[in-house]
Protein backbone atom coordinates (compact mmCIF):
# COMPACT_ATOMS: atom_id res chain seq x y z
CA UNK A 1 0.00 0.00 0.00
CA UNK A 2 1.27 3.47 -0.91
CA UNK A 3 1.02 6.06 1.85
CA UNK A 4 1.04 9.79 1.29
CA UNK A 5 3.80 11.82 2.98
CA UNK A 6 2.67 13.64 6.11
CA UNK A 7 4.46 16.53 7.80
CA UNK A 8 5.13 15.69 11.45
CA UNK A 9 4.51 18.26 14.14
CA UNK A 10 7.83 17.30 15.71
CA UNK A 11 10.72 14.89 15.35
CA UNK A 12 12.61 13.89 18.49
CA UNK A 13 16.13 12.47 18.12
CA UNK A 14 17.37 10.63 21.21
CA UNK A 15 21.14 11.11 21.68
CA UNK A 16 21.65 11.14 25.44
CA UNK A 17 23.33 7.75 25.91
CA UNK A 18 26.89 7.35 27.12
CA UNK A 19 27.80 4.60 24.68
CA UNK A 20 30.07 2.71 27.08
CA UNK A 21 30.59 -0.18 24.65
CA UNK A 22 32.42 2.18 22.29
CA UNK A 23 35.16 2.44 24.94
CA UNK A 24 35.88 6.00 23.86
CA UNK A 25 36.34 9.46 25.32
CA UNK A 26 34.31 10.73 22.37
CA UNK A 27 30.52 10.61 22.75
CA UNK A 28 29.13 7.75 20.70
CA UNK A 29 26.90 9.99 18.61
CA UNK A 30 29.92 12.06 17.51
CA UNK A 31 31.84 9.12 16.07
CA UNK A 32 32.13 9.71 12.31
CA UNK A 33 30.57 7.63 9.58
CA UNK A 34 30.89 8.70 5.96
CA UNK A 35 32.29 12.08 6.92
CA UNK A 36 29.48 13.00 9.32
CA UNK A 37 28.92 12.27 13.01
CA UNK A 38 26.35 9.57 13.67
CA UNK A 39 23.88 12.05 15.11
CA UNK A 40 24.37 14.25 12.05
CA UNK A 41 22.94 11.49 9.85
CA UNK A 42 19.95 11.14 12.16
CA UNK A 43 19.26 14.87 12.26
CA UNK A 44 19.53 15.20 8.47
CA UNK A 45 17.02 12.39 8.01
CA UNK A 46 14.70 14.04 10.55
CA UNK A 47 15.09 17.46 8.96
CA UNK A 48 14.20 15.94 5.60
CA UNK A 49 10.63 15.38 6.83
CA UNK A 50 10.22 19.17 7.21
CA UNK A 51 8.88 19.01 10.78
CA UNK A 52 7.52 22.04 12.58
CA UNK A 53 9.92 21.29 15.44
CA UNK A 54 13.18 19.31 15.56
CA UNK A 55 14.47 18.32 19.00
CA UNK A 56 17.62 16.45 20.02
CA UNK A 57 17.88 15.04 23.54
CA UNK A 58 21.37 15.13 25.07
CA UNK A 59 22.95 14.20 28.36
CA UNK A 60 26.42 12.62 28.16
CA UNK A 61 28.95 15.37 27.27
CA UNK A 62 26.01 17.49 26.19
CA UNK A 63 28.03 20.68 25.72
CA UNK A 64 30.46 18.94 23.39
CA UNK A 65 27.67 17.44 21.30
CA UNK A 66 25.77 20.74 21.20
CA UNK A 67 28.90 22.55 19.97
CA UNK A 68 29.48 19.93 17.26
CA UNK A 69 25.93 20.37 15.97
CA UNK A 70 25.81 24.17 16.04
CA UNK A 71 27.21 24.69 12.54
CA UNK A 72 24.99 22.32 10.56
CA UNK A 73 21.90 22.41 12.77
CA UNK A 74 21.62 25.92 14.23
CA UNK A 75 17.84 25.79 14.63
CA UNK A 76 17.56 22.42 16.37
CA UNK A 77 16.07 22.52 19.87
CA UNK A 78 18.26 20.92 22.53
CA UNK A 79 16.61 19.17 25.48
CA UNK A 80 18.70 17.87 28.37
CA UNK A 81 17.80 14.58 30.01
CA UNK A 82 18.07 14.51 33.80
CA UNK A 83 19.34 11.63 35.95
CA UNK A 84 16.18 9.55 35.49
CA UNK A 85 17.21 6.83 33.02
CA UNK A 86 15.35 5.45 30.05
CA UNK A 87 14.06 6.32 26.62
CA UNK A 88 10.67 7.23 28.02
CA UNK A 89 12.21 9.86 30.27
CA UNK A 90 14.26 11.18 27.33
CA UNK A 91 11.07 11.72 25.33
CA UNK A 92 9.42 13.41 28.33
CA UNK A 93 12.35 15.86 28.47
CA UNK A 94 11.92 16.55 24.74
CA UNK A 95 8.20 17.20 25.16
CA UNK A 96 8.97 19.73 27.89
CA UNK A 97 10.96 21.72 25.30
CA UNK A 98 7.99 21.75 22.89
CA UNK A 99 4.77 23.79 23.05
CA UNK A 100 2.36 22.44 25.66
CA UNK A 101 -0.49 22.49 23.14
CA UNK A 102 1.45 20.57 20.47
CA UNK A 103 -0.85 18.39 18.37
CA UNK A 104 -0.35 16.06 15.44
CA UNK A 105 2.27 13.42 14.74
CA UNK A 106 5.46 13.16 16.79
CA UNK A 107 8.24 10.99 15.36
CA UNK A 108 10.86 9.53 17.69
CA UNK A 109 14.18 8.23 16.37
CA UNK A 110 17.76 7.70 17.55
CA UNK A 111 21.08 9.44 17.08
CA UNK A 112 23.00 6.21 16.48
CA UNK A 113 20.96 4.84 13.54
CA UNK A 114 22.80 6.42 10.58
CA UNK A 115 21.17 4.68 7.61
CA UNK A 116 17.57 5.53 8.46
CA UNK A 117 16.32 7.71 5.60
CA UNK A 118 14.01 10.69 5.37
CA UNK A 119 11.88 8.67 2.96
CA UNK A 120 11.30 5.97 5.55
CA UNK A 121 10.39 8.53 8.21
CA UNK A 122 7.95 10.13 5.78
CA UNK A 123 6.40 6.72 5.06
CA UNK A 124 6.02 6.14 8.78
CA UNK A 125 4.34 9.50 9.32
CA UNK A 126 2.08 8.90 6.32
CA UNK A 127 1.02 5.41 7.45
CA UNK A 128 0.39 6.73 10.95
CA UNK A 129 -1.85 9.53 9.73
CA UNK A 130 -3.66 7.39 7.16
CA UNK A 131 -4.47 4.71 9.73
CA UNK A 132 -5.67 7.11 12.38
CA UNK A 133 -3.25 5.42 14.77
CA UNK A 134 -2.29 6.51 18.25
CA UNK A 135 1.06 4.74 17.84
CA UNK A 136 2.83 3.32 14.80
CA UNK A 137 6.06 1.42 15.34
CA UNK A 138 8.66 0.77 12.67
CA UNK A 139 9.59 -2.93 12.70
CA UNK A 140 11.71 -5.43 10.78
CA UNK A 141 12.13 -9.20 10.59
CA UNK A 142 15.69 -10.21 11.48
CA UNK A 143 17.35 -13.59 11.13
CA UNK A 144 19.20 -12.81 14.36
CA UNK A 145 17.12 -10.50 16.56
CA UNK A 146 19.56 -10.58 19.50
CA UNK A 147 19.72 -7.26 21.29
CA UNK A 148 16.46 -5.86 19.95
CA UNK A 149 13.11 -5.48 21.67
CA UNK A 150 10.57 -8.02 20.39
CA UNK A 151 7.21 -6.98 18.91
CA UNK A 152 4.29 -8.80 20.53
CA UNK A 153 1.08 -9.40 18.59
CA UNK A 154 -2.29 -11.06 18.87
CA UNK A 155 -5.05 -11.46 16.32
CA UNK A 156 -5.93 -7.77 16.48
CA UNK A 157 -2.45 -6.34 15.93
CA UNK A 158 0.46 -5.08 18.02
CA UNK A 159 -0.07 -5.57 21.74
CA UNK A 160 3.26 -4.35 23.02
CA UNK A 161 7.04 -4.53 22.93
CA UNK A 162 9.27 -6.34 25.39
CA UNK A 163 12.96 -5.52 25.81
CA UNK A 164 15.34 -8.45 25.48
CA UNK A 165 16.45 -8.30 29.12
CA UNK A 166 12.81 -8.60 30.25
CA UNK A 167 11.65 -11.16 27.66
CA UNK A 168 10.59 -14.73 28.35
CA UNK A 169 12.07 -17.64 26.42
CA UNK A 170 8.96 -17.72 24.21
CA UNK A 171 9.20 -13.99 23.52
CA UNK A 172 12.91 -14.26 22.70
CA UNK A 173 12.00 -16.59 19.83
CA UNK A 174 10.10 -13.78 18.08
CA UNK A 175 11.98 -12.46 15.02
CA UNK A 176 9.99 -9.27 14.48
CA UNK A 177 11.93 -6.53 16.24
CA UNK A 178 11.30 -3.01 17.35
CA UNK A 179 13.46 -0.50 15.52
CA UNK A 180 13.00 2.05 18.29
CA UNK A 181 11.50 4.44 15.76
CA UNK A 182 7.89 5.50 16.35
CA UNK A 183 5.11 7.78 15.26
CA UNK A 184 2.88 8.97 18.12
CA UNK A 185 -0.23 11.07 18.37
CA UNK A 186 1.04 13.92 20.55
CA UNK A 187 -1.73 13.94 23.16
CA UNK A 188 -1.67 10.15 23.60
CA UNK A 189 2.10 10.25 24.01
CA UNK A 190 1.98 12.91 26.73
CA UNK A 191 -0.80 11.22 28.67
CA UNK A 192 0.69 7.73 28.52
CA UNK A 193 4.22 8.78 29.44
CA UNK A 194 2.88 10.29 32.62
CA UNK A 195 1.75 6.80 33.69
CA UNK A 196 4.90 4.83 32.80
CA UNK A 197 6.73 3.42 35.81
CA UNK A 198 10.20 1.89 36.33
CA UNK A 199 9.16 -1.62 37.29
CA UNK A 200 11.60 -3.51 35.06
CA UNK A 201 15.00 -5.20 35.21
CA UNK A 202 16.86 -2.00 34.36
CA UNK A 203 14.85 0.35 36.55
CA UNK A 204 14.32 2.64 33.55
CA UNK A 205 11.37 4.54 32.11
CA UNK A 206 10.76 2.52 28.94
CA UNK A 207 9.21 4.28 25.97
CA UNK A 208 7.97 0.88 24.82
CA UNK A 209 5.56 0.74 27.78
CA UNK A 210 3.54 3.49 26.10
CA UNK A 211 2.26 1.01 23.52
CA UNK A 212 0.46 -1.25 25.99
CA UNK A 213 -0.92 1.76 27.90
CA UNK A 214 -2.28 3.32 24.72
CA UNK A 215 -3.81 0.02 23.63
CA UNK A 216 -5.41 -0.47 27.06
CA UNK A 217 -6.97 2.98 26.73
CA UNK A 218 -8.52 2.01 23.39
CA UNK A 219 -5.93 3.62 21.13
CA UNK A 220 -4.93 2.01 17.85
CA UNK A 221 -1.36 0.57 17.77
CA UNK A 222 -0.01 -0.58 14.40
CA UNK A 223 3.34 -1.44 12.84
CA UNK A 224 5.03 -0.51 9.58
CA UNK A 225 7.32 -3.33 8.49
CA UNK A 226 10.61 -2.33 6.90
CA UNK A 227 12.25 -4.58 4.32
CA UNK A 228 15.69 -2.96 4.51
CA UNK A 229 17.01 -4.01 7.91
CA UNK A 230 20.15 -1.85 7.50
CA UNK A 231 18.01 1.23 8.05
CA UNK A 232 17.22 0.25 11.62
CA UNK A 233 20.66 -0.99 12.62
CA UNK A 234 22.23 0.99 15.42
CA UNK A 235 25.80 1.47 16.61
CA UNK A 236 26.76 0.14 20.02
CA UNK A 237 30.42 -0.74 19.50
CA UNK A 238 33.25 -0.22 17.02
CA UNK A 239 32.53 -3.45 15.16
CA UNK A 240 28.98 -2.32 14.42
CA UNK A 241 30.30 1.10 13.43
CA UNK A 242 32.63 -0.53 10.89
CA UNK A 243 29.82 -2.71 9.50
CA UNK A 244 27.50 0.27 9.05
CA UNK A 245 30.26 2.42 7.58
CA UNK A 246 31.00 -0.25 4.98
CA UNK A 247 27.32 -0.57 4.07
CA UNK A 248 26.89 3.20 3.86
CA UNK A 249 29.92 3.42 1.58
CA UNK A 250 28.63 0.59 -0.62
CA UNK A 251 25.37 2.49 -1.07
CA UNK A 252 27.20 5.73 -1.81
CA UNK A 253 29.38 4.09 -4.46
CA UNK A 254 26.39 2.43 -6.11
CA UNK A 255 24.52 5.74 -6.21
CA UNK A 256 27.45 7.43 -7.99
CA UNK A 257 27.99 4.57 -10.43
CA UNK A 258 24.32 4.70 -11.41
CA UNK A 259 24.76 8.46 -11.91
CA UNK A 260 27.51 7.95 -14.51
CA UNK A 261 30.71 7.79 -12.46
CA UNK A 262 33.25 5.04 -13.19
CA UNK A 263 34.60 3.46 -10.01
CA UNK A 264 37.22 0.94 -11.07
CA UNK A 265 37.46 -0.93 -7.77
CA UNK A 266 34.65 -0.37 -5.27
CA UNK A 267 36.40 -2.63 -2.75
CA UNK A 268 39.21 -0.08 -2.29
CA UNK A 269 37.23 3.14 -2.76
CA UNK A 270 35.71 5.25 0.03
CA UNK A 271 33.56 8.30 -0.65
CA UNK A 272 32.01 10.47 2.06
CA UNK A 273 28.35 11.42 2.05
CA UNK A 274 28.92 15.10 1.18
CA UNK A 275 31.27 14.53 -1.78
CA UNK A 276 29.93 15.60 -5.20
CA UNK A 277 30.92 13.89 -8.47
CA UNK A 278 29.93 14.79 -12.03
CA UNK A 279 29.08 12.28 -14.77
CA UNK A 280 32.08 10.77 -16.58
CA UNK A 281 34.40 11.14 -13.61
CA UNK A 282 36.76 8.17 -13.26
CA UNK A 283 37.83 6.96 -9.83
CA UNK A 284 40.76 4.55 -9.96
CA UNK A 285 41.61 1.98 -7.25
CA UNK A 286 42.70 3.04 -3.78
CA UNK A 287 40.93 6.41 -3.66
CA UNK A 288 39.42 8.13 -0.62
CA UNK A 289 37.31 11.26 -1.12
CA UNK A 290 36.36 13.10 2.06
CA UNK A 291 34.56 16.18 3.27
CA UNK A 292 33.14 18.46 0.59
CA UNK A 293 35.40 17.31 -2.23
CA UNK A 294 34.01 18.18 -5.69
CA UNK A 295 35.15 16.48 -8.90
CA UNK A 296 34.04 17.87 -12.27
CA UNK A 297 33.21 15.96 -15.43
CA UNK A 298 35.95 14.03 -17.20
CA UNK A 299 38.40 14.26 -14.32
CA UNK A 300 40.41 11.21 -13.27
CA UNK A 301 41.36 10.65 -9.63
CA UNK A 302 43.77 7.93 -8.57
CA UNK A 303 45.10 5.46 -8.17
CA UNK A 304 46.01 5.70 -4.48
CA UNK A 305 44.85 9.24 -3.74
CA UNK A 306 43.23 10.83 -0.68
CA UNK A 307 41.45 14.16 -1.13
CA UNK A 308 39.69 16.12 1.61
CA UNK A 309 37.73 19.28 0.75
CA UNK A 310 39.42 19.47 -2.66
CA UNK A 311 37.89 20.90 -5.84
CA UNK A 312 39.02 19.10 -9.00
CA UNK A 313 38.27 20.76 -12.34
CA UNK A 314 36.95 19.18 -15.52
CA UNK A 315 39.42 16.93 -17.31
CA UNK A 316 42.04 17.13 -14.57
CA UNK A 317 44.27 14.22 -13.56
CA UNK A 318 45.13 13.65 -9.90
CA UNK A 319 47.18 10.52 -9.24
CA UNK A 320 48.88 9.19 -6.13
CA UNK A 321 48.22 12.46 -4.34
CA UNK A 322 47.31 13.51 -0.81
CA UNK A 323 45.45 16.82 -0.77
CA UNK A 324 43.30 18.93 1.53
CA UNK A 325 41.51 22.27 1.12
CA UNK A 326 42.92 22.78 -2.36
CA UNK A 327 41.73 23.64 -5.88
CA UNK A 328 42.90 21.86 -9.05
CA UNK A 329 41.97 23.66 -12.26
CA UNK A 330 40.52 22.32 -15.50
CA UNK A 331 42.89 20.05 -17.39
CA UNK A 332 45.57 20.32 -14.71
CA UNK A 333 47.84 17.46 -13.68
CA UNK A 334 48.84 16.55 -10.14
CA UNK A 335 51.23 13.79 -9.07
CA UNK A 336 52.27 11.14 -8.80
CA UNK A 337 53.34 11.49 -5.17
CA UNK A 338 52.25 15.10 -4.69
CA UNK A 339 51.14 16.71 -1.42
CA UNK A 340 48.61 19.54 -1.72
CA UNK A 341 48.29 21.32 1.60
CA UNK A 342 45.57 23.85 2.48
CA UNK A 343 45.46 26.97 0.35
CA UNK A 344 46.88 25.39 -2.81
CA UNK A 345 45.28 26.68 -6.02
CA UNK A 346 46.50 25.20 -9.31
CA UNK A 347 45.29 26.95 -12.45
CA UNK A 348 43.91 25.37 -15.60
CA UNK A 349 46.40 23.25 -17.57
CA UNK A 350 48.95 23.65 -14.78
CA UNK A 351 51.09 20.93 -13.27
CA UNK A 352 52.21 19.94 -9.79
CA UNK A 353 54.42 16.94 -10.40
CA UNK A 354 56.30 14.14 -8.72
CA UNK A 355 57.36 14.68 -5.11
CA UNK A 356 56.13 18.27 -4.99
CA UNK A 357 54.63 19.79 -1.83
CA UNK A 358 52.58 22.99 -1.98
CA UNK A 359 51.00 25.10 0.75
CA UNK A 360 49.09 28.39 0.58
CA UNK A 361 50.28 28.75 -2.99
CA UNK A 362 48.60 29.96 -6.18
CA UNK A 363 50.05 28.52 -9.39
CA UNK A 364 48.69 30.19 -12.50
CA UNK A 365 47.28 28.85 -15.71
CA UNK A 366 49.70 26.63 -17.61
CA UNK A 367 52.46 26.98 -15.02
CA UNK A 368 54.42 23.94 -13.89
CA UNK A 369 56.28 22.74 -10.84
CA UNK A 370 57.26 19.38 -12.30
CA UNK A 371 59.25 17.63 -9.58
CA UNK A 372 61.10 17.52 -6.25
CA UNK A 373 60.09 20.96 -4.96
CA UNK A 374 58.45 22.79 -2.07
CA UNK A 375 56.26 25.79 -2.90
CA UNK A 376 54.91 27.50 0.20
CA UNK A 377 53.34 30.96 0.61
CA UNK A 378 53.83 31.83 -3.04
CA UNK A 379 52.06 33.22 -6.09
CA UNK A 380 53.27 32.00 -9.49
CA UNK A 381 51.88 33.64 -12.60
CA UNK A 382 50.82 32.07 -15.88
CA UNK A 383 52.91 29.79 -18.12
CA UNK A 384 55.94 29.78 -15.85
CA UNK A 385 58.22 26.84 -15.07
CA UNK A 386 59.92 26.13 -11.76
CA UNK A 387 62.98 23.89 -12.12
CA UNK A 388 63.49 20.65 -10.23
CA UNK A 389 64.57 20.66 -6.58
CA UNK A 390 63.42 24.23 -5.94
CA UNK A 391 62.53 25.45 -2.45
CA UNK A 392 60.47 28.49 -1.58
CA UNK A 393 62.03 29.52 1.74
CA UNK A 394 59.08 31.15 3.48
CA UNK A 395 59.91 31.01 7.19
CA UNK A 396 62.69 32.78 9.09
CA UNK A 397 61.92 31.08 12.39
CA UNK A 398 59.57 33.85 13.52
CA UNK A 399 57.52 35.09 10.57
CA UNK A 400 56.37 33.72 7.25
CA UNK A 401 56.78 35.76 4.08
CA UNK A 402 55.55 35.43 0.52
CA UNK A 403 57.27 34.97 -2.84
CA UNK A 404 55.80 36.26 -6.10
CA UNK A 405 56.84 34.88 -9.49
CA UNK A 406 55.53 36.51 -12.66
CA UNK A 407 54.29 35.23 -16.02
CA UNK A 408 56.40 33.29 -18.55
CA UNK A 409 59.25 32.86 -16.08
CA UNK A 410 61.85 30.09 -16.53
CA UNK A 411 63.67 29.24 -13.32
CA UNK A 412 66.60 26.83 -13.14
CA UNK A 413 66.93 23.70 -11.09
CA UNK A 414 67.97 23.75 -7.43
CA UNK A 415 66.89 27.35 -6.86
CA UNK A 416 66.00 28.79 -3.48
CA UNK A 417 63.62 31.74 -3.13
CA UNK A 418 64.25 33.50 0.19
CA UNK A 419 61.00 35.37 0.91
CA UNK A 420 59.93 38.08 0.66
CA UNK A 421 61.12 38.30 -2.92
CA UNK A 422 59.62 39.00 -6.36
CA UNK A 423 60.64 37.57 -9.73
CA UNK A 424 59.44 39.69 -12.64
CA UNK A 425 57.72 38.59 -15.84
CA UNK A 426 59.89 36.79 -18.37
CA UNK A 427 62.84 36.38 -16.00
CA UNK A 428 65.26 33.45 -16.02
CA UNK A 429 67.63 32.00 -13.44
CA UNK A 430 70.60 29.68 -13.53
CA UNK A 431 70.83 26.34 -11.79
CA UNK A 432 71.70 26.50 -8.11
CA UNK A 433 70.73 30.15 -7.70
CA UNK A 434 69.76 31.48 -4.28
CA UNK A 435 67.38 34.36 -4.94
CA UNK A 436 67.56 36.82 -2.05
CA UNK A 437 66.79 40.00 -4.02
CA UNK A 438 64.04 40.92 -6.45
CA UNK A 439 64.69 39.86 -10.05
CA UNK A 440 63.60 42.48 -12.63
CA UNK A 441 61.39 41.50 -15.56
CA UNK A 442 63.40 39.90 -18.33
CA UNK A 443 66.57 39.54 -16.24
CA UNK A 444 68.76 36.47 -15.74
CA UNK A 445 69.48 35.79 -12.08
CA UNK A 446 72.68 33.90 -11.34
CA UNK A 447 74.88 33.99 -8.27
CA UNK A 448 76.79 30.70 -8.31
CA UNK A 449 80.49 31.10 -7.43
CA UNK A 450 83.06 30.07 -10.08
CA UNK A 451 83.89 26.38 -9.94
CA UNK A 452 87.32 25.40 -8.60
CA UNK A 453 88.90 22.00 -9.30
CA UNK A 454 91.58 20.89 -6.80
CA UNK A 455 93.63 18.50 -8.92
CA UNK A 456 94.88 15.37 -7.16
CA UNK A 457 92.75 15.90 -4.04
CA UNK A 458 91.39 12.33 -3.90
CA UNK A 459 94.82 10.70 -4.23
CA UNK A 460 96.24 13.02 -1.58
CA UNK A 461 93.36 12.99 0.91
CA UNK A 462 91.78 9.55 0.38
CA UNK A 463 94.66 7.23 -0.52
CA UNK A 464 93.89 3.52 -0.67
CA UNK A 465 90.17 4.00 -1.23
CA UNK A 466 88.25 2.68 -4.26
CA UNK A 467 87.82 6.30 -5.36
CA UNK A 468 91.58 6.87 -5.26
CA UNK A 469 92.23 3.67 -7.20
CA UNK A 470 89.69 4.70 -9.85
CA UNK A 471 91.22 8.17 -10.09
CA UNK A 472 94.70 6.70 -10.48
CA UNK A 473 93.55 4.43 -13.30
CA UNK A 474 91.90 7.35 -15.08
CA UNK A 475 95.07 9.44 -14.71
CA UNK A 476 97.21 6.60 -16.01
CA UNK A 477 94.95 6.10 -19.03
CA UNK A 478 94.95 9.80 -19.85
CA UNK A 479 98.78 9.99 -19.73
CA UNK A 480 99.36 6.65 -21.44
CA UNK A 481 101.01 5.13 -18.37
CA UNK A 482 100.53 1.36 -17.91
CA UNK A 483 99.24 0.54 -14.45
CA UNK A 484 100.83 -2.27 -12.46
CA UNK A 485 98.86 -5.46 -13.04
CA UNK A 486 99.59 -6.87 -9.60
CA UNK A 487 98.27 -3.83 -7.74
CA UNK A 488 95.62 -4.84 -5.20
CA UNK A 489 92.30 -3.12 -5.79
CA UNK A 490 90.38 -2.30 -2.64
CA UNK A 491 86.86 -3.80 -2.63
Swiss-Prot record:
Pfam families: NTP_transf_3. Transmembrane segments: none annotated. It comes from the Bacteria. One of its GO terms (cellular component) is membrane. It is an enzyme of class 2 (transferase). Residues 1-238 are annotated as: Pyrophosphorylase. Residues 460-491 are annotated as: Disordered. InterPro entries: Bifunctional_GlmU (IPR005882), GlmU-like (IPR050065), GlmU_C_LbH (IPR038009), MobA-like_NTP_Trfase (IPR025877), Nucleotide-diphossugar_trans (IPR029044), Trimer_LpxA-like_sf (IPR011004). Acetyl-CoA binds at residues 388, 394-395, 413, 431. Binds 1 Mg(2+) ion per subunit. Keywords: Acyltransferase, Cell shape, Cell wall biogenesis/degradation, Cytoplasm, Magnesium, Metal-binding, Multifunctional enzyme, Nucleotidyltransferase, Peptidoglycan synthesis, Repeat, Transferase. Mg(2+) binds at residues 112, 236. It is found in: Cytoplasm. The keyword Oxidoreductase does not apply. CDD domains: GT2_GlmU_N_bac, LbH_GlmU_C. Catalyzes the last two sequential reactions in the de novo biosynthetic pathway for UDP-N-acetylglucosamine (UDP-GlcNAc). The C-terminal domain catalyzes the transfer of acetyl group from acetyl coenzyme A to glucosamine-1-phosphate (GlcN-1-P) to produce N-acetylglucosamine-1-phosphate (GlcNAc-1-P), which is converted into UDP-GlcNAc by the transfer of uridine 5-monophosphate (from uridine 5-triphosphate), a reaction catalyzed by the N-terminal domain. Homotrimer. This is Bifunctional protein GlmU. The gene is glmU.
Amino acid sequence: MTTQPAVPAAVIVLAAGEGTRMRSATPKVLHPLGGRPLVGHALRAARGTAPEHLVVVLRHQADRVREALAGDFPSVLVALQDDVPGTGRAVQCALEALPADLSGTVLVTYGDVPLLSSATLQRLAGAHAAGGNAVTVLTALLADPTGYGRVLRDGTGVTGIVEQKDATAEQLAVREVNSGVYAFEAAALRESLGRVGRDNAAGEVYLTDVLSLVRAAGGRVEALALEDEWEIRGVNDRAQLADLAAEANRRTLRRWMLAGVTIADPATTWIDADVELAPDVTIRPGVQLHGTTRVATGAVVGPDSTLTDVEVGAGALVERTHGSSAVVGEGAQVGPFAFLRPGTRLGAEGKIGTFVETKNATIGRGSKVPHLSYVGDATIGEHSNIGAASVFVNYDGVNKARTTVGDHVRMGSDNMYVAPVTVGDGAYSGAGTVIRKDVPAGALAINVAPQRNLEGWTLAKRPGTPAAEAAQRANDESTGTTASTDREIQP
